[in-house]
């Protein structure tokens, strides 16, 4: 049995083995001195070693397997600090701010997803400076190609086990089926450099404690409530973590998303958070600027596909109304969601003159909302160390929270995300004390210098005020590099008549 580096032809390890009937577990340890490391998108190269493992019997090759492996150290740092507990990825000893989105299956009919579509989907993440996708627990364990592409393009994967928004009778044969399914997938995926963590489920813990499920079952039958909770803990606190510990012992297991504490409480100081007060909760978009979490693993804002995509399922002009039967049939959130889009849009902009203009302004609205959230989360670094919006893609032509529609067309949000996810972000913000602050966030691993230019402009294009400063940008940091009282910056010009343009020259 030999292991060979395909690039150099060097035999890394080999030994003579005796095989018995059935499974044979054989270890072939070897050392790679000064290895080329695998980095996530934006931090370095995604070097993959190609190892060929060959079994030779009587001087003939009986079997050969090729495995591409990225060498990296990866930890989820979840330890106490003065505010609660940290929650972030440490890659090759470096804290990494996770920038990305949630991923769902690409089609309701999975055989229609071609290798070309897989590559476009992952490239569309990498090309807007994402470094993480969360595979949502209501979808599927993706095929090998998906993870190979994430390895190739430096996209870390938050991997949910496939359980979502439900309770499962996890005992007996079903619990054993759950265990075997988990074993199959952990073994299949454990050698991929992209795998960042394993998560037990999507929102099941939150549903039990915060959606009223526990109270309802307890009121109906306290003994039944105890039985359900026993099954729940057997599934997410015993079976799944045991599988990860046995088959991928260096991987991190997280019981649920969102999750803060085992008693079901959710707070801003621990774990990850799904934040939906903007959108479902109808709060203003600027509320994003005030919310905190260690890691935002879900939040979102809806839009329709762009007009050319809509015309593929609503080709007739009489259907060009968001409340038409056709458009309502392609709305993931029903009447409620259309009303939310309309309310938010009219709060921010004038009424669009026609259907096409409405779709366009809806795209701008969605993009501005998610940009506001991303910038707020990045400014809060290192307290907050992750932002994954809902969602990266769609599985059918529909109005949804996706930044790319079913046909792969980028919505405005995807372009907004590309800018908000750049390695150096310049983000103006006013605080409650009526001070204009300019924050610069850098994901770079080395400090650098730059010239900051800040211009206060009227909407007519007339310049009200301008500033220019030479600044030092610290590595892997968020810092306020310029502040000025708002009154001084505006020179008595009403706030509603101006905008701030800040740029690094």
Please tell me what each predicted stretch does.
Residues 1-132, 379-380, 384, 409, ...:
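Secreted/periplasmic carbohydrate-active enzymes, especially glycoside hydrolases
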Residues 13-15, 80, 110-113, 145-146, ...:
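Short, solvent-exposed loop/turn and secondary-structure capping segments
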Residues 35-38, 52, 59-166, 172-197, ...:
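Active-site-adjacent substrate/metal-binding segments within catalytic domains
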Residues 124, 184-188, 242-243, 372-376, ...:
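A generic secondary-structure signal
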Residues 198, 205, 235, 242-250, ...:
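Substrate-binding clefts and catalytic carboxylate motifs of secreted carbohydrate-active enzymes
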């Amino acid at each position: 049995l030999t292991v060979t580096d395909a690039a150099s032809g060097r035999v890394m390890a080999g030994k003579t083995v005796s095989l018995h009937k059935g499974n044979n577990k054989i270890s072939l340890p070897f050392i790679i001195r000064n290895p080329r490391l695998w980095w996530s998108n934006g931090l370095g190269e995604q070097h993959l070693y190609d190892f060929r493992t060959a079994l030779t019997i009587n001087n003939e090759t009986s079997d050969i397997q090729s495995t591409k492996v990225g060498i990296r150290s990866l930890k989820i740092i979840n330890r106490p600090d003065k505010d609660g507990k940290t929650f972030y990825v440490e890659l090759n000893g470096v804290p990494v701010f996770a920038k990305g989105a949630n991923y769902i299956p690409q089609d309701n009919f999975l055989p229609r997803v071609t290798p070309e579509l897989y590559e476009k989907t992952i490239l569309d993440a990498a090309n807007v400076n994402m470094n993480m996708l969360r595979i949502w627990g209501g979808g599927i364990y993706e095929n090998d190609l998906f993870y190979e592409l994430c390895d190739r393009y430096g996209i870390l994967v938050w991997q949910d086990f496939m359980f979502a928004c439900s309770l499962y009778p996890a005992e007996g044969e079903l619990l054993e089926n759950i265990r075997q399914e988990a074993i199959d997938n952990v073994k299949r995926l454990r050698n991929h450099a992209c795998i960042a963590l394993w998560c037990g489920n999507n929102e099941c813990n939150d549903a039990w404690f915060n959606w009223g499920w526990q109270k309802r079952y307890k009121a109906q039958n306290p003994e039944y409530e105890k039985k359900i909770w026993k099954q729940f803990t057997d599934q997410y606190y015993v079976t799944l973590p045991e599988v990860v510990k046995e088959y991928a012992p260096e991987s991190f297991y997280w019981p649920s998303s969102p999750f803060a504490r085992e008693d079901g409480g959710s707070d801003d100081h621990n774990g990850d958070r799904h934040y939906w007060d903007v959108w479902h909760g109808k709060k203003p978009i600027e509320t994003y600027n005030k919310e905190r979490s260690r890691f935002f693993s879900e939040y979102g804002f809806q839009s329709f596909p762009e007009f050319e995509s809509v015309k593929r399922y609503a080709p007739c002009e009489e259907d060009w109304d968001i409340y038409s039967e056709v458009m309502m049939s392609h709305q993931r959130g029903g009447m409620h969601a259309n009303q939310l889009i309309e309310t938010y849009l009219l709060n921010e902009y004038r009424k669009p003159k026609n259907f096409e203009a409405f779709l366009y302004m809806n795209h701008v609205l969605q993009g501005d909302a998610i940009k506001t959230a991303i910038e707020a989360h990045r400014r809060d670094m290192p307290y907050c160390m992750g932002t994954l919006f809902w969602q990266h893609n769609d599985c059918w032509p529909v109005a949804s929270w996706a930044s790319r529609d079913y046909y792969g067309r980028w919505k405005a949000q995807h372009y907004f995300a590309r800018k908000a996810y750049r390695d150096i972000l310049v983000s103006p913000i006013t605080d409650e004390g009526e001070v204009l602050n300019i924050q610069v966030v850098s994901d770079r691993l080395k400090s650098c210098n730059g010239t900051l230019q800040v211009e206060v402009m009227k909407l007519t294009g007339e310049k009200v005020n301008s500033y220019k400063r030479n600044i030092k940008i610290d590595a892997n940091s968020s810092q306020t590099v310029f502040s000025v009282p708002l009154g001084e910056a505006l020179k008595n010009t009403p706030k509603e008549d101006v905008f701030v343009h800040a740029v690094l020259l």
